[in-house]
């Protein structure tokens, strides 16, 4: 190996190492704080948990109602992601494969929704949910999550589906497949990498969503995990130890999902480039 190549590899490894430390250090710090009490953290913010208080997780799950918040987040996010996958893939398939007069108008209308900041839609969504009796309900929050993530889901899937060769669809039609048959038997199997990408991105984004949830949910028994964590941070109460425990409970599912599906995510994000 030439000296220049060795130098480039050393520089690349150094950059990756620095990034890993910068990205991982805050997570490690929160993990250590999650095993310490607030008084211990106040006395030594960067101290090692000795002894580690593992019982804090059980207490957070039951006494602090994190179990309820976790269930609410799971129901809302999973239902929203399922709806996004079905509706987004069908819409992307329709606009990618079938050309009609207003095809591009619909495309740019959906794409433009990605550009606008979410604060612009909060008031209108609040009024719609109140009007239809969906304010302060899990269903209402789930529908809002579908609305805010659908443009990005559609954009990713449409770009992938549009690159599927037309010959595949012609062959499926010759074999007797209906329009829905083409979608279920051809588009979905081929588009699995892109669909997996949208599922992971939507899970991560919606699991950590706070802005819409804090406006649209008022009852404590309907709070999501981000709202539940904020209960321990206020003017009269600041339980840093329990906040750290709640943060670890919140991020563990995201870490597990990414660990198991990261290969599909990378493959899906690069598939359209390699086509």
Which sequence ranges carry the predicted segments?
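Short, Lys/Arg-rich, polar N-terminal cytosolic tail immediately upstream
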Residues: 1-6
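A structural signal for multi-pass alpha-helical bundles of membrane permease subunits
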Residues: 8-275
């Amino acid at each position: 190996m030439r000296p220049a190549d060795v130098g480039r590899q050393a520089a690349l490894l150094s950059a990756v190492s620095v990034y890993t430390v910068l990205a991982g250090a805050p997570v490690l710090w929160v993990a250590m704080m999650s095993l310490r009490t607030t008084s211990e953290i106040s006395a030594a913010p960067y101290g090692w948990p000795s002894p580690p208080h593992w019982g804090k997780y059980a207490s957070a799950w039951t006494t602090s109602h994190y179990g309820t918040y976790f269930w609410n987040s799971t129901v809302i996010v999973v239902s929203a992601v399922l709806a996004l996958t079905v509706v987004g893939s069908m819409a992307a398939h329709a606009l990618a494969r079938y050309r009609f007069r207003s095809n591009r108008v619909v495309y740019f209308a959906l794409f433009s929704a990605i550009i606008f900041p979410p604060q612009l839609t909060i008031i209108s969504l609040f009024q719609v949910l109140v009007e239809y009796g969906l304010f302060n309900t899990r269903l209402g929050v789930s529908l809002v999550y579908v609305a805010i993530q659908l443009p990005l889901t559609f954009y990713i899937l449409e770009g992938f589906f549009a690159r599927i060769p037309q010959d595949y669809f012609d062959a499926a039609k010759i074999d007797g497949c209906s329009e829905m048959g083409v979608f279920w038997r051809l588009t979905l199997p081929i588009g699995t990498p892109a669909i997996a990408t949208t599922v992971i991105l939507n899970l991560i984004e919606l699991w950590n969503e706070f802005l819409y949830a804090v406006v649209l949910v008022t009852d404590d028994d309907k709070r999501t995990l981000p709202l539940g964590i904020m209960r321990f941070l206020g003017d009269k109460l600041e339980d840093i130890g329990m906040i750290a425990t709640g943060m670890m409970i919140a991020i563990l599912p995201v870490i597990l999902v990414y660990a198991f599906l990261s290969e599909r995510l990378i493959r899906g994000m690069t598939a359209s480039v390699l086509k």
